Amino acid sequence: MTAREVLKILHKDGWYEVDQEGSHMQLKHPTKPGKVTVAVHGKKDIPPGTLNKIWKQAGL
């Protein structure tokens, strides 16, 4: 799964971009605690462990 696909799912869940430094984008949710960081590296797939961490942080 690419970062673009992950961001699409997160945006549908209500997450929005709050900061970006280089290729790392941070997102925040209006009601869920914390932030989620997604590394956007073109069309490369996100490694499975990183993807699981993103879903866990996002509460999905």
Task: Tell what function each PLM region has.
Residues 1-19, 30-60:
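Basic nucleic-acid-binding interfaces
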Residues 24-28:
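Minor-groove-contacting beta-hairpin "wing" of winged helix-turn-helix DNA-binding domains
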